[in-house]
């Protein structure tokens, strides 16, 4: 704009700060972490859903078969539901991230949306993992103060499946923590430096 236009009363319009291009390595790491989240979610759900074991229980009233399955515990059902949502979420967000891979500039709003949803899902998965871990620990060790006996010596296969599922879901929560760091860092790098 020339000085002549300014003198005639034309007010210069403020320009928005330039949007910094996103580093491609962050996009690749984001997609890889989302695929890892999908794999961990599927593996944990499969381990939990296949954790059924039937044993003959002897009691003073006779012996009968008794099945241990994940549906008997609300904590395990919550874990399966949370990880199913995490798996679906990882598919959707991986596709969104892949669609923005070829674009030179990614809108900051996308990073905000991903960051908020990643944090929300991290809370859900971490709560489900902790809840299932608490129930699993009582099944493993029992609680002598309230006379809850351990079940690991009777339902060993069931306990192994549940334990492996909880460990893999803990890995899924760690992947979500890394996704939060990656998206927060990507958003931070886009803040204009004055």
UniProtKB/Swiss-Prot annotation:
Keywords, ordered alphabetically: Cell membrane, Membrane, Transmembrane, Transmembrane helix
Q: Which InterPro entries does the entry link to?
A: CASP/CASPL, CASP_dom, CASPL
Pfam families annotated for this entry?
Answer: CASP_dom (PF04535)
Q: Where in the cell is it found?
A: Cell membrane
Q: Which residues cross the membrane?
A: 28-48, 76-96, 110-130, 162-182
Query: What is the membrane topology noted in the UniProt record heading this document?
Result: Multi-pass membrane protein
Instruction: Give me the Extracellular side stretches, as residue ranges.
Output: 49-75, 131-161
Q: Name one GO cellular component term.
A: plasma membrane
Tell me which parts of the chain lie in the Cytoplasmic compartment: 1-27, 97-109, 183-194
**So what family is this one in?**
Belongs to the Casparian strip membrane proteins (CASP) family.
The record's note on quaternary structure and interaction partners says:
Homodimer and heterodimers.
Q: What is this protein called?
A: CASP-like protein Ni6
Q: Which organism is it from?
A: Beta vulgaris subsp. maritima
Its gene name is Ni6
